Amino acid sequence: MARNEIRPIVKLRSTAGTGYTYVTRKNRRNDPDRLMLKKCDPVVRRHVDFREER
C-alpha cells in the first residue's frame, strides 16, 4: 500500500469563520468519518472546533 492511501493529508478549518487552517494527517482505518478537533485559533485567540475539509 502506498503511504498516502492510509494516512492522507487533511485540512482542518476553523468553525469560527476566520478561515484559519491546520494541516495534519489522519488514519483512515481509525477515523473513517470527518475529523473534528478543538484547537487554538490565533485570529480570535480562543479554542474553537476545527473540522476536516475535503
From Swiss-Prot:
Keywords associated with the record: Ribonucleoprotein, Ribosomal protein
Family annotation (Gene3D superfamilies): Ribosomal protein L33
Single GO cellular component term: cytosolic large ribosomal subunit
InterPro entries listed in its UniProt record: Ribosomal_bL33, Ribosomal_bL33_sf, Ribosomal_zn-bd
GO-annotated molecular function: structural constituent of ribosome
UniProt record, GO biological process: translation
SUPFAM superfamilies per record: Zn-binding ribosomal proteins
Pfam family of the protein (one): Ribosomal_L33
HAMAP family named among the record's database cross-references: Ribosomal_bL33
Family: Belongs to the bacterial ribosomal protein bL33 family.
Protein name, entry field: Large ribosomal subunit protein bL33B
Species the sequence originates in: Mycobacterium sp. (strain KMS)
Gene designation: rpmG2
